[in-house]
Amino acid sequence: TPKEAQALADKARRLGMRLLGPGSLGLVHTHPGVRLAAGLAPLPKEGVLAISSQSGTLGRAVLAFAEEMGLGVASFVSLGAKADISSNDLLQFWEEDERTRVILLYLEHFGNPRRFSRLARRIGKKKPILAVHPSRDPLVRALFAQAGVVRANSLEEAFDVALLLAQG
């Protein structure tokens, strides 16, 4: 339940840890010194694309699609229900990650839209941010436009753009 997830996140914080999930597929990091596949996701080839998905099921498909297109992945994080770690936390990590050159987000909802907008505006000046959001809500469209996020209408479209940006 959400209440139990929050209690777990609170306990993790008290112990000095962060919590991914619940409902997360896990995370992948392909840096040669760290190569990590924590969860059920296979380890993709190393690359410059950072990917986040809230959906674990979709996450597996996203990694398979990246492999099919020949796109290497710097890191992949399946956020799950986001009791603690959010897309905003990932954006801050990827901003500092020298290997990440392109960021792709599959967002189902925003925890803190203002913070997202502020971070995306800053980070997007250095690294392009692509996003897929299942809603056709004009407010989401406006948020992405204001933040400088490139909105894709589908994962296929997002990966086509990511492929071009990763090569450039």
For each predicted feature, which ranges?
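Catalytic-core regions of core metabolic enzymes
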Residues: T1-G168
